[in-house]
From Swiss-Prot:
Transmembrane regions: 25-48, 57-78, 100-119, 139-157, 195-218, 236-258, 272-291
Encoding gene (name): OR2L8
Job of this protein: Odorant receptor.
Keywords, sorted A to Z: Cell membrane, Disulfide bond, G-protein coupled receptor, Glycoprotein, Membrane, Olfaction, Receptor, Sensory transduction, Transducer, Transmembrane, Transmembrane helix
Extracellular side: 1-24, 79-99, 158-194, 259-271
Family: Belongs to the G-protein coupled receptor 1 family.
Protein name listed in UniProt: Olfactory receptor 2L8
Lineage per the UniProt record: Eukaryota, Metazoa, Chordata, Craniata, Vertebrata
Length: 312
């Protein structure tokens, strides 16, 4: 493998786990999760599009989250499945750059979008009379396009860097996708300045939004506590707890992975943590948002009845 790495520009993805007897089990499990994520997120997007009761800022943002998750998991899992089926773990230099770009762009966009969703709930509960003004269609579009553009600019900057640094060591990336920190460890130049920019990016895309989300929900919980309506209080708590669950699943492993000093990082640990925000979160998000949401379940019933009536 060492000779291959020195004469080829391709990278080698070592995968999630070393080869073992239970490879087939992991393959089936990951493909199953991928299909669940595909069905769940597509269903959420179509449901919000087809049911007029869900044409609100909250669900408009949720449909974008599902779109991001759909693309997010599709950037990584199909390549993993292909590697297992064909036994070829190589990925071209350009292919690695493309995968890295989409991973960073979608990851950054999702982090910012989750902050926008927290702001939406903050305005809806703390300033209900101003909700339609502060969360107009124009504001929602600006939030969404801003998330995509900022995430893409950040991704472009990091991808251009990793594609231009010299790789004179083994080209075997100890990961299951082209993760920038894992790629940088293969460089034959000092990258401490760049690692500082990674820390800065992680702070901008993870720490600042998380602080904003925490402050928003601190205000929300205070407002909910003083609500007179028990039903309104229950609904608000349910909505907030759902979003906080999603935020925790996404931010916690990301923050722990990217904000740790290099000396404390472990490739095995990084790969396991990456499973949470690249594979599990896209599958769990539509389930979490729909399982206890009466509006989503009601919309599902209405759309199903409409489809059945058309067939009859």
């Amino acid at each position: 493998m060492e000779n291959y790495n020195q004469t080829s520009t391709d990278f080698i993805l070592l995968g999630l786990f070393p080869p073992s007897r239970i490879d087939l089990f992991f393959f089936i499990l990951i493909v199953f999760i991928f299909l669940m994520a595909l069905i769940g997120n597509l269903s959420m997007i179509l449901l919000i599009f087809l049911d007029t009761h869900l044409h609100t800022p909250m669900y408009f943002l949720l449909s974008q989250l599902s779109l991001i998750d759909l693309n997010y998991i599709s950037t990584i899992v199909p390549k993993m499945a292909s590697d297992f089926l064909h036994g070829n773990k190589s990925i071209s230099f350009t292919g690695c750059g493309i995968q890295s770009f989409f991973f960073l762009a979608l990851g950054g966009a999702e982090a910012l979008l989750l902050a926008s969703m927290a702001y939406d709930r903050y305005i809806a509960i703390c300033f209900p009379l101003h909700y339609l003004i502060r969360m107009s269609k124009r504001v929602c579009v600006l939030m969404i396009t801003g998330s995509w553009i900022i995430g893409s600019i950040n991704a472009c900057a990091h991808t251009v860097y990793v594609l231009h640094i010299p790789y004179c060591r083994s080209r075997a990336i100890n990961h299951f996708f082209c993760d920038v920190p894992a790629m940088v460890t293969l460089a034959c130049m000092d990258t401490w300045v760049y690692e500082g920019t990674v820390f800065l990016s992680a702070t901008i895309f993870l720490v600042f939004p998380f602080i904003g989300i925490s402050c928003s929900y601190g205000q929300v919980l205070f407002a909910v506590y003083h609500m007179k309506s028990a039903e309104g209080r229950k609904k608000a708590y349910l909505t907030c707890s759902t979003h906080l669950t999603v935020v925790t699943f996404y931010y916690a492993p990301f923050v722990y992975t990217y904000l740790r000093p290099r000396s404390l990082r472990s490739p095995t640990e990084d790969k396991v943590l990456a499973v949470f925000y690249t594979i599990l979160t896209p599958m769990l998000n539509p389930i979490i948002y729909s399982l206890r949401n009466k509006e989503v379940m009601g919309a599902l019933t209405r759309v199903s009845q409409r489809i059945c009536s058309v067939k009859m």
